Amino acid sequence: MRKFWSMLAVLGLGVVVTMCSRAEQKEKDVKKADTRVFELRTYYAAPGKMDSLNARFRDHTCALFKKHGMEIVAFWNPSDPKEADKKLIYVLAYPSKEAADKSWKAFRDDPEWIKARDASEKDGKLVDKVESVYMNPTDYSPMK
């Protein structure tokens, strides 16, 4: 009978340890989600350059973002026809602001990016202006 109670105690301890471990992992996952940072970027294309800007993203930039740990959330053009050929809007996600800074530095220093940028701008700059806003999700946001 003593063996039975000893085994039951060990089994119970194992269950408690497993539950605590799972709770701890869930807490880490929540904290990780809470620290994710999003970046909203708006590019104002140079006149007549939106097609070239979209091509550069499609053919080069997106792959380089992924290479440097930049999670692409989505890309948009405004639905207003007057603005559609002027703006490219997109959102990236990162584990933290520090990770974003590190990723952008690596991206900008990447010889593949420099080559793609220079080739795409042989007939002039594609972008007149860039706006960037880093954002943290609210506690009620469905996306974190």
Question: Locations of the language-model features?
Answer:
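Active-site-flanking beta-strand signature of metal-NTP-handling nucleotidyl enzymes
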Residues: 38-42, 89
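Short, surface-exposed ligand-recognition loops at beta-strand->loop->(often short) alpha-helix junctions
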Residues: 45-54
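A short, glycine/Asx- and small/polar-enriched loop/turn
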Residues: 83-88
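Bacterial N-terminal signal peptides
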Residues: 8-16
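Bacterial N-terminal signal peptides that target proteins for export
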Residues: 1-9
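An amphipathic, aromatic/His-enriched active-site/gating alpha helix that lines ligand/cofactor pockets
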Residues: 24-34, 55-73, 81, 93-134, ...
